[in-house]
Regions:
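Solvent-exposed beta-strand/loop surfaces, strongest in extracytoplasmic domains of secreted
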Residues: 1-194, 210-211, 218, 262-264, ...
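Exported/extracytosolic protein signature
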Residues: 192-434
C-alpha cells in the first residue's frame, strides 16, 4: 500500500526590508537634503530587485510622507515605503528642505556735514524669483560721526505696521547673511574744508554808518555739529570783547549765542572796512571753524584842516594907523574825521614860515590849537589902505602817510588902514629985532 503525503508549496512575498528573512536583495535608494526653491520637492524612491529590475510604484510598493508640505522648510520629512503585491516589508527614508542662503547688503557712504541726514541704499540677493518682500534701509547719520546703515526686512510671516500677509517670501525658508554698511559724516578735510557758515555765523546791524569811536555789536551763533555733546569755545580777535566764550555740554545740533563788541578805529576808517573773525573749537577734536563778518558801512575817510585868523584887541571896524600893532590869533582846527600829524601852520605876513612856522605833533578830530601873532602897520599898508593877512598849513595825510596832502582851508583876515594924507607944512618967521 502506497501512502502519499502531499506537500504544500508556499510562495511568500519578498521583503524589501534587509532585516527580514525574506529579503532577497531589493534595494531602496536614499534621498539627499535639498535647498528651498519655492517648488514642490517631493522625493520619490527608486526600488529595484536583486536582479536590478525596477519595481513599480503603487504595484510593488507604496510611498507615504509624514508631512504634506514638501515645498517649504518644515524640518525632517519621513518617507515610508511599504511593499505591495508580491512584496512586503517596510522601510523608511528621511530628508529635509534646507533654507536658501540670502544676502542682505546695505551700502556705506561718507560725506561732509551739511545739516541734512546722510542715508544710503541696500539690496537683497537670493530670494526666489516671484516671491515678494518688504525692504528698506533705515540708517541715518546727520551729525559728525558714524553709525551702521541699518535696514528693515518684512517677510510674509512678519507683522510690521500692519503689513502681515502683504508679502509671500517666508523668513523660515531662508538663511540670512548680513553685510552692513557704515554711514560717516565728517567735519571736512584740509583739501575740502567744511563751509564754516554751517557751524558759525556772525552778523551786525548793517542799517547804520559807523564812524571812529562807534561801537559795533556782533551777534555770534555756533552750532554743535557732532553726534555727542560738546563744550564750545569761542575766540575773538584782539580788541573784540565777548560777553561769553565757553559753553559746556551743548547737545548735538544745538546752537549757542554770544555777543561781541568792537570800537571802530581811525585805521578802520582809512581801510574802509573792518573784518571780524571768530574761531570756534569743540572739546575732544582738533577741528577749528572761523566765522567772518565784514563791516563796510564805515564813513568815508575825510582828513581836513581849517585855519582861521582873527584880529584881537580892537573893536570891529577899527582903522589902524601907521606904526600901530595889529594882534592876531591863528587857529588850526581839525574838522575832518582822522587825526592829523606833523601839522605846520605858516603866516607869511608875520614871518612865521619855514623854520619859524608853528608846528603841532598831532591834532585829533574836532581839536583846535591857537597861536598869537602881531604885526606893525607899515607905510606900504597905509598906501594900500588895508592889511591882508593869510595863514595856511600842511599835515600828513593819514590815508597816505607818504604824501602830506591833507586838504587845508587857509585863513585870511583883512583890516582897514587910515587913508593916506601926505602933506608938508612950511612955517616962515622973521627976526624983527634987527
Amino acid at each position: 500500500k502506497v501512502v502519499e503525503t502531499i506537500g504544500t508549496l508556499t510562495v511568500t512575498a519578498q521583503s524589501i526590508d534587509p532585516d527580514n528573512p525574506n529579503y532577497k536583495g531589493i534595494t531602496v535608494d536614499a534621498p539627499t537634503d535639498v535647498e528651498y526653491t519655492g517648488e514642490d520637492q517631493t522625493w520619490l524612491p527608486t526600488v529595484t530587485d536583486g536582479n536590478g529590475k525596477a519595481l513599480v510604484k503603487d504595484t510593488d510598493y507604496t510611498v507615504t510622507y509624514d508631512n504634506e508640505d514638501r515645498t517649504n522648510v518644515t524640518g525632517i520629512i519621513t518617507v515610508t515605503i511599504n511593499g505591495a503585491g508580491n512584496y512586503a516589508g517596510t522601510i523608511t527614508r528621511t530628508y529635509q528642505i534646507t533654507p536658501k542662503p540670502v544676502t542682505i547688503t546695505t551700502e556705506s557712504k561718507t560725506r561732509a556735514f551739511d545739516g541734512t541726514a546722510l542715508t544710503a541704499g541696500g539690496k537683497v540677493e537670493g530670494i526666489v524669483s516671484g516671491e515678494t518682500y518688504g525692504f528698506k534701509t533705515t540708517g541715518s547719520q546727520t551729525y559728525v560721526g558714524s553709525s551702521q546703515n541699518t535696514y528693515e526686512m518684512v517677510w510674509a510671516d512678519s507683522e510690521v505696521e500692519g503689513t502681515s500677509g502683504t508679502y509671500t517670501a517666508k523668513k523660515t525658508n531662508y538663511t540670512v547673511t548680513e553685510s552692513i554698511g557704515t554711514l560717516v559724516v565728517t567735519a571736512g578735510t584740509p583739501e575740502n574744508p567744511l563751509d564754516p557758515t554751517l557751524v558759525v555765523n556772525k552778523t551786525h546791524d548793517k542799517s547804520q554808518t559807523y564812524k571812529a569811536g562807534d561801537v559795533i555789536t556782533f551777534t555770534i551763533t555756533a552750532k554743535n555739529i557732532y553726534e555727542e555733546a560738546k563744550t564750545i569755545t569761542l575766540e575773538e580777535l584782539e580788541g573784540v570783547a565777548l560777553d561769553a566764550n565757553v559753553f559746556e555740554n551743548v547737545a548735538p545740533g544745538a546752537e549757542v549765542t554770544a555777543t561781541a563788541t568792537y570800537t571802530v578805529t581811525e585805521q578802520d576808517i582809512v581801510n574802509g572796512t573792518f573784518t571780524n573773525n571768530v574761531t570756534v573749537t569743540f572739546s575732544g577734536v582738533d577741528d577749528k571753524f572761523t566765522g567772518t563778518d565784514t563791516v563796510d558801512e564805515l564813513e568815508d575817510a575825510n582828513p581836513h584842516m581849517t585855519i582861521t585868523k582873527t584880529t584881537v584887541g580892537a573893536e570891529e571896524g577899527h582903522i589902524y594907523k601907521l606904526g600901530e600893532v595889529i594882534n592876531y590869533k591863528v587857529t588850526a582846527t581839525n574838522d575832518g574825521n582822522l587825526t592829523l600829524t606833523n601839522v605846520k601852520v605858516e603866516d607869511a605876513l608875520t614871518g612865521n614860515v619855514g623854520e619859524n612856522a608853528f608846528t603841532i605833533d598831532t591834532l585829533a578830530p574836532d581839536e583846535a590849537q591857537t597861536f598869537d601873532v602881531r604885526y606893525v602897520v607899515t607905510e606900504n599898508d597905509v598906501l594900500a589902505g588895508k592889511v591882508v593877512n593869510n595863514a595856511t598849513g600842511t599835515a600828513t595825510d593819514p590815508t597816505d602817510p607818504d604824501e602830506p596832502k591833507t586838504p587845508v582851508t587857509p585863513g585870511e583876515k583883512e583890516d582897514p588902514i587910515e587913508t593916506p594924507n601926505p602933506s608938508l607944512a612950511v612955517v616962515k618967521t622973521s627976526d624983527k629985532t634987527g
